[in-house]
Amino acid sequence: MRLCDKDILTHLQEGKISITPEPDYAEISGVTVDIRLGNKFRVFTEHQAPYIDLSGPKAQVQEALNTVMSDEISVGQDKSFYLHPGELALAVTLESVTLPGNIVGWLDGRSSLARLGLMVHVTAHRIDPGWSGNIVLEFFNSGKLPLALKPGMKIGALSFEVMSDFAEKPYNARVDAKYKNQEGAIASRISGDDKTSTQ
């Protein structure tokens, strides 16, 4: 069952869902809570690597990722981050979100930004039950013009769904959780995947 605005507010007031900084009532409407852009970004740097072999040995994958990803970029609150057409960048939400083991969250971009060509998440829009931390955004500019993105701007919305029961393996309890207590624009940790798995 998807939570409506009054249920979202109740869950926040009762501490079942935590969003820090706490959203204003005006930011909760229908079935969503507005979220804002943080000030940390990562981009792909100029590189000579022809490809990244995602099925290769962990050390080799990590070395390739270190070659192509920038260090974290911090943008001042009065400055903008410019995303050019055809570019992918990682960003982070201003808000940190904590969910209990029986609620899954969903991230959606804003229609107004999509109409300018901005994708807020490339594919990863689920926030697992038991999640705690900032949410990394995978920005892609599919439009024709550079987009100036300013920290603090409204960037998307979260909705929440109550599951049939508490998860047996919530995110915060998983040993293999690569982004536990995430802060900042964390780069891909795909090198931490179990390469022996057939799933």
UniProtKB/Swiss-Prot annotation:
Belongs to the dCTP deaminase family. The lineage of its organism: Bacteria, Pseudomonadati, Pseudomonadota, Gammaproteobacteria, Alteromonadales. Catalyzes the deamination of dCTP to dUTP. Pathway: Pyrimidine metabolism; dUMP biosynthesis; dUMP from dCTP (dUTP route): step 1/2. The keyword Nucleotide-binding applies. The active site is at E138 (proton donor/acceptor). Keywords: Hydrolase, Nucleotide metabolism, Nucleotide-binding. Disulfide bonds: none annotated. It catalyses: dCTP + H2O + H(+) = dUTP + NH4(+). Gene3D superfamilies: 2.70.40.10. SUPFAM superfamilies: dUTPase-like (SSF51283). Its EC number is 3.5.4.13. This is dCTP deaminase. It comes from Pseudoalteromonas atlantica (strain T6c / ATCC BAA-1087).
